[in-house]
């Protein structure tokens, strides 16, 4: 874990590049689990306070515990005591805050799924490096943010290094969805009840009564209700409507095909 005796990189800078931000993240996420938590979180705040005071950026409150509590109340949206990478980007002075750029233009689950549908061009269940580059380029244009080819390449590689949890050079849907605010990330709701390929095939076949290879939104409603009841999880009408809308963003002309739903509900995307 990062200790006070080991100076973390770049915290004193007035503005961070995307690459520098990533180095800070890796420094404090010592166990590499995708969160800064526990002692890691305490170390981060101690070092951030030191760096800001050293560079003349005094905090409003000198009370470490109070400041840390305020931060967690503001950014720890699901109150799990952990800080995610995209949340950290909101307090560090990151150049052209590229993570927030995602959130401004892919702010809801439905918009995110529409973007995923566009850039997962081969419908593999992954966005690969060349597809991600196009995704980022379009987002930067939407945000009217100037960029050049080297900067676009840096953003692409940084996002890959941030969210490519298994190091295969491509992003699965669940990995990419970490760009969404926690409260908008409907995919988190399916954690702990992912299906195997065999389980998915059985449930899809049950609801695809006419064996057409796709289901409509009403059949999806029934499928989601069944899935939640099976896993003893509660879901109200509004949640069901939101989840259905998000998943149906993957559909073509109201038809949700087996392969697209499998990306959302299975442990691994289809090969």
Curated annotation (Swiss-Prot):
List of residues that carry Phosphotyrosine: 214
Gene: CALB2
Residues where Ca(2+) 4 binds: 164, 166, 168, 170, 175
Sites where the protein binds Ca(2+) 3: 120, 122, 124, 126, 131
Superkingdom of source: Eukaryota
Entry protein name: Calretinin
SS bond partners: none
InterPro entries in alphabetical order: CALB2, Calbindin_Ca-bind, EF-hand-dom_pair, EF_Hand_1_Ca_BS, EF_hand_dom
